[in-house]
C-alpha cells in the first residue's frame, strides 16, 4: 500500500460534541490515514471511540492508526504511531505483525528516521514545521531538512505541525508524502467545510478522491 495523502489526527478537545460527525466529514473528503489521538486515562472511553472509528474507517477504506498505544492497536487489529518516548519499534512490530502500519516520530532528526527504518517503521514523521496548537514545544523542522530526508530515507515521509492549506504546498514540493493535520482540518465551522478542506489537501498532493 502506497502511503500518500491526508493524515487526519483527532483532538478530543477540539472535536468535543462533534467528534464522529467531523471525522466522517473528513473521511468523506478523502483520508489516507486517520490517527486516534487521546491522551486521557479513560481506557473504556478510548476503546469505545476507537472501535467506532475503526467501523467508520472500514466503511471509507481508510487505515486507522492509534497514537502511542500498541496494545490497543493490537486489540483492534489496526496500526500504531509511536513517539520517541515510547521505546523502540521492534516490540510493536512483533506484537502487531508484519502487515500493520507503524509510524515513528523523528522530530527534525534524519538519523532517527534511518533508525526507525531499520526497526521496521512503515513511515516516518518530521515536525513541527509551523507553530502548532497541538505540540507548541516540539522542536522545529525546516523544508531544507525535509529535502535532505527525502534524499536519504526510502520510507514515506509524514510532515506535521501547524499545517494548513495555505502553507502545505512547499512541504509537498520538498518530498512530503503524508500531510498530518489537526486544526487545519478539524478547526472548521461545519462538516461541509471539513470535507472541503480534506479534498483541498488531496488536491495539493494530486490525489483524486
Curated annotation (Swiss-Prot):
* S-S bridge residues: none
Q: Name one GO biological process term.
A: thiamine biosynthetic process
Question: Residues that bind Mg(2+), according to the entry?
Answer: 68, 86
Residues annotated for 2-[(2R,5Z)-2-carboxy-4-methylthiazol-5(2H)-ylidene]ethyl phosphate binding in this entry: 132-134, 162
- Single GO cellular component term: cytoplasm
Q: Where does 4-amino-2-methyl-5-(diphosphooxymethyl)pyrimidine bind?
A: 35-39, 67, 105, 135
Which pathway, per its entry?
Cofactor biosynthesis; thiamine diphosphate biosynthesis; thiamine phosphate from 4-amino-2-methyl-5-diphosphomethylpyrimidine and 4-methyl-5-(2-phosphoethyl)-thiazole: step 1/1
- Needed cofactors: Mg(2+)
Q: How is the cofactor bound?
A: Binds 1 Mg(2+) ion per subunit.
Q: What is its EC number?
A: 2.5.1.3
Q: Which Gene3D superfamilies match?
A: Aldolase class I
Question: What does the UniProt keyword field contain?
Answer: Magnesium, Metal-binding, Thiamine biosynthesis, Transferase
One GO MF annotation is: magnesium ion binding
**Role description:** Condenses 4-methyl-5-(beta-hydroxyethyl)thiazole monophosphate (THZ-P) and 2-methyl-4-amino-5-hydroxymethyl pyrimidine pyrophosphate (HMP-PP) to form thiamine monophosphate (TMP).
NCBIfam families linked = thiE
- What name does this protein carry? Thiamine-phosphate synthase
**Species, as recorded:** Pseudomonas fluorescens (strain SBW25)
**Gene that this sequence comes from:** thiE
Amino acid at each position: 500500500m502506497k502511503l500518500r495523502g491526508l493524515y487526519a489526527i483527532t483532538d478530543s478537545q477540539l472535536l468535543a460534541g462533534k467528534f464522529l460527525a467531523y471525522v466522517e466529514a473528513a473521511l468523506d473528503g478523502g483520508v489516507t490515514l486517520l490517527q486516534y489521538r487521546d491522551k486521557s486515562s479513560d481506557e473504556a472511553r478510548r476503546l469505545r471511540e476507537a472501535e467506532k472509528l475503526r467501523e467508520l474507517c472500514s466503511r471509507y477504506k481508510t487505515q486507522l492508526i492509534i497514537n502511542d498505544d500498541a496494545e490497543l492497536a493490537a486489540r483492534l487489529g489496526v496500526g500504531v504511531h509511536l513517539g520517541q518516548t515510547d521505546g523502540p519499534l521492534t516490540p510493536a512490530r512483533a506484537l502487531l505483525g508484519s502487515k500493520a502500519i507503524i509510524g515513528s516520530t523523528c522530530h527534525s532528526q534524519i538519523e532517527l528516521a534511518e533508525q526507525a527504518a531499520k526497526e521496521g517503521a512503515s513511515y516516518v514523521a518530521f515536525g513541527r514545521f509551523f507553530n502548532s496548537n497541538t505540540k507548541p514545544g516540539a522542536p522545529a523542522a525546516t523544508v531544507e531538512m525535509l529535502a535532505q530526508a527525502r534524499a536519504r530515507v526510502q520510507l514515506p515521509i509524514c510532515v506535521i505541525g501547524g499545517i494548513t492549506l495555505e502553507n502545505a504546498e512547499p512541504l509537498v514540493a520538498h518530498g512530503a508524502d503524508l500531510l498530518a493535520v489537526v486544526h487545519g482540518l478539524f478547526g472548521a465551522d461545519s462538516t461541509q467545510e471539513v470535507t472541503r478542506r480534506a479534498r483541498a489537501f488531496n488536491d495539493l498532493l494530486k490525489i483524486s478522491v
